[in-house]
Design a protein with these regions (language model features):
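Cysteine-nucleophile amide-bond enzymes
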Residues: 1-29, 33-36, 40-165
Length: 165
């Protein structure tokens, strides 16, 4: 599962909103497929510009991500690096493109079900559900850190108090 962070949550939410509001969608088009919509949000490139960059590599986003090399500055590699900076791994990119992350599917409203990668409504619900799941994970991490910090502070104070007696 992707690393929970505000940037990724916002990208998923904005991409879902764009799709809901009628943005062009075509699963077979690098610039207007699932990852293409995330890239439109984070890069501010349009679908045509993303397609031009993506055509410097071969395959779908899944293959491009697997072959990604951070050293080259090929246009497709720059796009994959944007996705990785959001907290996505090649597996996450594959799951976004194919709507296959089991954690997201189990978190769907109404429970687990398979979604179709090329159905706009399925992409919207997947993006929104993934954003909600990441938001919950991020919230849990923040609460856990605060709790650990509080417990550490309390134990430090108790130790200091014990030395006085």
């Amino acid at each position: 599962m992707a690393y929970p962070n505000i940037g990724l949550i916002e990208a998923l939410t904005n991409a879902a909103n764009n799709l809901r509001n009628g943005a062009d969608y075509a699963w077979g088009h690098h610039g207007s497929c699932n990852c293409g919509h995330i890239l439109q949000v984070v890069t501010k490139l349009n679908k045509k510009e993303i397609l031009e960059h993506a055509q410097s590599a071969h395959g779908e986003w899944t293959e491009i991500a697997e072959e990604y090399c951070g050293i080259t500055n090929a246009p497709a590699s720059l796009l994959v690096s944007k996705l990785e900076k959001l907290g996505l791994t090649p597996s996450d990119i594959h799951n976004l493109e194919y709507l296959e992350d089991r954690n997201v599917l189990e978190y769907l409203p109404g429970g687990f079900r398979w979604l179709k990668r090329n159905i706009r409504e399925d992409v919207i619900v997947y993006f929104e559900t993934m954003a909600e799941l990441l938001r919950a994970e991020l919230s849990n991490k923040i609460i856990s850190r605060r709790l650990n910090k509080s417990l550490h502070t309390m134990s430090t104070e108790e130790e200091a108090g014990a030395e006085v007696y």
